């Protein structure tokens, strides 16, 4: 789940 949030933030 953490990766998902990080991917959206990096985008």
UniProtKB/Swiss-Prot annotation:
GO function terms (MF aspect): sodium channel regulator activity; toxin activity
Keywords of the record: Disulfide bond, Ion channel impairing toxin, Ionotropic glutamate receptor inhibitor, Knottin, Neurotoxin, Postsynaptic neurotoxin, Secreted, Toxin, Voltage-gated sodium channel impairing toxin
Superkingdom assignment: Eukaryota
Reported tissue expression: Expressed by the venom gland.
Entry PTM: Contains 5 disulfide bonds.
Subcellular localization: Secreted
Location (main, coarse): secreted
Any one GO cellular component localisation term in the record: host cell postsynaptic membrane
Domain notes: The presence of a 'disulfide through disulfide knot' structurally defines this protein as a knottin.
Family per record: Belongs to the neurotoxin 03 (Tx2) family. 05 subfamily.
Function, in words: This insecticidal neurotoxin targets two types of channels/receptors. It reversibly inhibits the N-methyl-D-aspartate (NMDA)-subtype of ionotropic glutamate receptor (GRIN). It inhibits glutamate uptake from rat brain synaptosomes, and blocks GRIN in hippocampal slices. It also acts on sodium channels of both insects and mammals.
Protein name: GAMMA-ctenitoxin-Pb1a
Source organism: Phoneutria boliviensis
Organism classification: Eukaryota, Metazoa, Ecdysozoa, Arthropoda, Chelicerata
């Amino acid at each position: 789940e953490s990766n998902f949030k990080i991917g959206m933030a990096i985008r």
